[in-house]
Swiss-Prot record:
It comes from the Eukaryota. Residues 157-198 are annotated as: Disordered. GO terms for biological process: translation. SUPFAM superfamilies: Ribosomal proteins L15p and L18e. The gene is RPL18-A. It is found in: Cytoplasm. It comes from Leishmania major. Residues 179-198 have a biased composition (Basic residues). This is Large ribosomal subunit protein eL18. Keywords: Cytoplasm, Ribonucleoprotein, Ribosomal protein. Belongs to the eukaryotic ribosomal protein eL18 family.
Length: 198
């Protein structure tokens, strides 16, 4: 008799070799960066190609404040400097209204929100697309690859068992009023019997 091999299917890693996106712009970028990854020896193009293939939930957005904090550590910015390093985000860049002043930054992303684009341009920065980046830095020189937190989604808060001690996962049913009110709990003056139709 053979032995049942349980859990074998869980061990296999799912690796994407193509995109499921119907966006023609992303499909063209995948072609471009696949070509650059083959023709150049830089690992930058390979990483960008792999991230372009990923699903939207794995291409998490990032806020301007996070980019500003990271880029401030990396380099000192001068207004409208073309030699400043480029922050590369394979995803969306969103505005942060809590940040009154942002430094002049050069940012390349798949998409910018309207207010994020206005903030970058107003600060003397530059918003780049990936085809422009391929012309400026075909090997990824003078660039910093950044990405947003994947755990920032609201649905991630529900992952795990919410009733287990020490677990901070959010329950799906937050309003438990009728189940735990007076007359239902033991030791609260009386216990109401369940109503039955005869």
């Amino acid at each position: 008799m053979g032995v049942d091999l349980t859990g074998i299917s869980k061990k296999s890693r799912v690796i994407r070799h193509h995109t499921y996106s119907t966006n023609p712009y992303i499909k063209l970028l995948i072609k471009l960066y696949k070509f650059l990854a083959k023709r150049t020896s830089s690992g930058f193009n390979k990483v960008v190609y792999q991230r372009l293939i990923k699903s939207r939930s794995n291409r998490a957005p990032i806020s301007l404040s996070r980019i500003a904090v990271v880029m401030k550590r990396k380099a000192v910015f001068t207004a409208k400097s073309k030699a400043a390093p480029i922050a590369v985000v394979v995803g969306d860049v969103l505005d942060d209204v809590r940040m009154a002043r942002i430094p002049a930054m050069r940012v390349c992303a798949l998409r910018f929100s309207k207010s994020a684009r206005q903030s970058i341009v107003a600060a003397g920065g530059e918003c780049l697309t990936f085809d422009q980046l391929a012309m400026i830095a075909p090997t990824g020189k003078n660039t910093y690859l950044l990405r947003g937190r994947k755990s920032g989604r609201e649905s991630v808060r529900h992952f795990g068992a919410s009733g287990v001690p020490g677990s901070h996962s959010k329950p799906y049913a937050t309003n438990r009023g009728k189940e735990t009110k007076r007359g239902r709990r033991t030791g609260r003056s009386y216990k109401r019997k369940a109503f039955r139709h005869v």
